C-alpha cells in the first residue's frame, strides 16, 4: 500500500498542487497585466485610466470580477444552450492548460516534457474550436461571421508560428523548453569572445523569425491591429456579442491568458527565458523568475503599444500578410538555417 502511495498517489498530489499554485498565480498576473494594458492605453490617449477602486485603481480587476460573477447570464432564445455555455469554458481551459509546460525558472514547470513546445502548439490550435462553437451556438449573424474570421485567421498564422518552431528546433536540437533556454547561454556573443549576455539569445541570430513570431502572435491572439474577429466597427464584439456574465468573463480571461502565453513563449524562445542579460555576479544573484517576469512584461508592453498606435488592417490585408509575406519568409529562414548549420558542421 505504501508503495502504491509513493509511486502513484503522491506524484499525482504534487502535480495537482503545482497546478493549483500555477493557476492562482497566473490569474493574478493576468489581472494586473490587463490593468497595465488599460493604463498604457490611457497614457497614450492622455487619460488617467483605472483610478477609483483601490490606490491608483489597483483593485479594479477584482471589482470587475465581482461585477461579472453576480450578473445574470442571458442565453438567446434561439441559441443551442449546451454548446453556448460549453464554448467559453473550453476556450479558457485550453488557454490555461498550455501553461503547464512553461518553465519560469530552471526546474520550475508543472510538467517538464521533452516535446513542450509541440504540446503548446497542439493545445493552442484547439482554442479556435471554442470560438467557432460560441459563434455558431449564438444563432446570430455577427457572432458567426466573427467565428469564421477567427478560424481563417488562426489557421493562417499558425503556419508561420510552426515554421518559427522548426527554425528553433534546428538551432537548438530539442523541443524541450528548458533546453531551449539553456542553449542560449552560448551564441554569437561567446563566439566573439564576450561573456554570456543578451547577444547570445536567439533574438539576434534569428531576428527575422523573432519579428515573424511577434506579429503572428498578435494575429493568433486577435490583438490589434489584427482584431478582425471582434472588430467593433464591423462586428461589434464578434463571437462574444451574445455573451454576458461569467461566460463572457471566461472568453475575456482566455484571450488574455493566451496573450500572456505568447509573451512567455517569446521570452523562452528568443529572449533567454530566466537568464540574466549579462552573466556577471551581481545580476546572477537575482532570482531567475524575476528576469523571466521582466522579459514577459516587456513583451506585453510591446503588445500594448502596438494596440495603441497601429490602425486595424483590412481582412484581405491580414490574409495577404500571412500567406504572401510571412509564409515565404518563414520557409526561406528554415532552409537558410538548415543550410548554414550543415555547411558549418553545426548540425
From Swiss-Prot:
Predominant place of localization? membrane
* Gene name linked to the record: nuoH
Q: Protein name, please?
A: NADH-quinone oxidoreductase subunit H
Biological process terms from the Gene Ontology for this record are: aerobic respiration
Organism lineage string: Bacteria, Pseudomonadati, Pseudomonadota, Alphaproteobacteria, Hyphomicrobiales
Record the organism: Brucella melitensis biotype 1 (strain ATCC 23456 / CCUG 17765 / NCTC 10094 / 16M)
Broadest EC class assigned to this enzyme: translocase
Bilayer-crossing residues are: 13-33, 82-102, 115-135, 161-181, 198-218, 248-268, 286-306, 325-345
The catalytic activity, as recorded, is:
a quinone + NADH + 5 H(+)(in) = a quinol + NAD(+) + 4 H(+)(out)
UniProt topology in membrane:
Multi-pass membrane protein
